[in-house]
Amino acid sequence: MLRIAHRLDLQLRAAMDRAFPEQAAAARQASQPLDPQLAPASKPEFGDFQANGALALAKPLKQAPRQIATAIVAQLQADPAFTDLCLEPQIAGPGFINLTVRPERLAAEVSARLGDQRLGVPAVEQAAPVVVDFSSPNIAKEMHVGHLRSTIIGDSLARVLEFRGHPVLRLNHVGDWGTQFGMLITHLKQVAPDALDTADAVDLGDLVAFYREAKKRFDDDEAFQTTSREEVVKLQGGDPVSLKAWGLLCDQSRREFQKIYDRLDIRLNERGESFYNPFLPAVIDGLKDAELLVTDDGAQCVFLEGVQGKDGKPLPVIVQKSDGGFNYATTDLAAIRYRFGAAPDGDDARRVIYVTDAGQANHFAGVFQVAQRAGWIPEGARLEHVPFGLVQGEDGKKLKTRAGDTVRLRDLLDEAVERAETDLRSRLNEEERSESEEFIQHVAGTVGLAAVKYADLSQNRITNYQFSFDRMLALQGNTAPYLLYAVVRIAGIARKGGDLEVLTGQLQFSEPQEWALVRELLKFDAVIAEVEEELLPNRLCSYLFELSQVFNRFYDQVPVLKADAEALPSRLALCRLTADTLKSGLGLLGIPTLDRM
């Protein structure tokens, strides 16, 4: 109900100005206009909205809040635009003004959304380019469960921002540069030289094993260390043999990553660390020009303001090592500079969002401060870190295999689909239903992957969460199967003869369950705006779960297909809008829906 809320806010402000003209004029002069403090009602019995601004005026006006609220209400009642929108306001408690939208206006809002693909969610008036940096696996390493959160949280946020009308650049900042390639190329030259000049000579699993061997040699063998560093210098210098080997390794990993992305329906533009190599010297020059660089023990650093180590001294962000090499902070600064830079030499972004684990919070806080002090973040632009917690096993410890290894993402997704298939076959057997193998595979694949995505997204991303196949695949509770089944239930209404597409005349509602569903449906636009601002997909999940519950109560307690001729069209309209809203909301989470389960 964002449109109604905006209209009410303007009407309340005008009423306050008329009720207290002197105070309003003084407030405007101080650039602090009177605020009605309009918010959704905390409980259904309080109406639709609640205005709490009278309490804040009590001290400056030296009047009781209820007296102030009474004066504001009198002005509202004298405004025909307000009385056309709301029933008579009620003053509650110390001076809260409770507002209830007229039923016919709520019904009109539902009617408007029935013909609106955006379901009442307005596109932003001034779309600003947004960069969302997410997923970001490392070359020559398999994607593991830790990449799941960044990938699906980042994808969901990108979908919401795109839906709101922002041009979004989805970036995959893969780890495709650095010492690890010197190690790996040196090792492969000795044990599997074909992998360095022949495509697909080894698969990603082999590369991972070779990487572990190379890392052990690098840690234990000084001669191997020296050769590896020489290989890095060759790579940085553009040696054609080294570059070809590097390119083949990247391509092999890229193909494996893409299989995961295709499976999860993730769209990404790869732009690895290597992309920013040409811009690293300019970062140093820019920091020098801004007089931020300090030489400390041979390294070039920027000391942070307001951040001290255990010794009480300011912590440094090292941007160039004593040997002249660069590090992650330098690359991240180059990326920030490029992303905010004007086109065609930059992305021209006005909001840059990094979706990584919470363990990198201090790193990004330091890098962001350096970029801000260097003047690389345009005025009014936003640079944000979206941190997330760990994926834990049901024992509360970091999720591992029985052998103690990191869980491969591919294996986790396979198991989710296998378990969904087992559950489906068991249910079909209990119901004595016969379905084609194609149907079973499609439903199991959809439900399994949806369950994994939703279980993650429904948690507050800032906290750790416990991974449980049993919980996420359950048909009850705040799960993907529960929501998918709500959509299936509505599709069943159409199959049983309810035409969800035809609506003639005005909508009419009389039952409390109908009005509860109407009000829940009309919250969708506010929830999307909240996710766009707060970058918390779990708010959307909570809304969809509540909507499903409200719909199920409506459907269980109010006749739909057996309703009388007068009530039937309006109830079918509620079913249709519920299905559309669930499909749209789940789509923004990257979850497709089903007509049958």
Swiss-Prot record:
Q: Where is the composition biased (Low complexity)?
A: 23-32
- Pfam families annotated for this entry? Arg_tRNA_synt_N (PF03485), DALR_1 (PF05746), tRNA-synt_1d (PF00750)
Q: Which reaction does it catalyse?
A: tRNA(Arg) + L-arginine + ATP = L-arginyl-tRNA(Arg) + AMP + diphosphate
Q: What molecular function does GO assign, one term?
A: arginine-tRNA ligase activity
- Enumerate the InterPro entries for this protein: aa-tRNA-synth_I_CS, Arg-tRNA-ligase, Arg-tRNA-synth_N, Arg-tRNA-synth_N_sf, ArgRS_core, DALR_anticod-bd, Rossmann-like_a/b/a_fold, tRNAsynth_Ia_anticodon-bd
Which GO terms of the cellular component aspect does the record hold? cytoplasm
One of the protein's GO biological processes: arginyl-tRNA aminoacylation
Q: Does the keyword ATP-binding apply?
A: yes
The places in or outside the cell where this protein is found are: Cytoplasm
Q: What is its EC number?
A: 6.1.1.19
Q: Which family does it belong to?
A: Belongs to the class-I aminoacyl-tRNA synthetase family.
Q: Do you know which HAMAP family this protein is assigned to?
A: Arg_tRNA_synth (MF_00123)
Tell me the protein's name: Arginine--tRNA ligase
Q: To which species is this protein native?
A: Synechococcus sp. (strain WH7803)
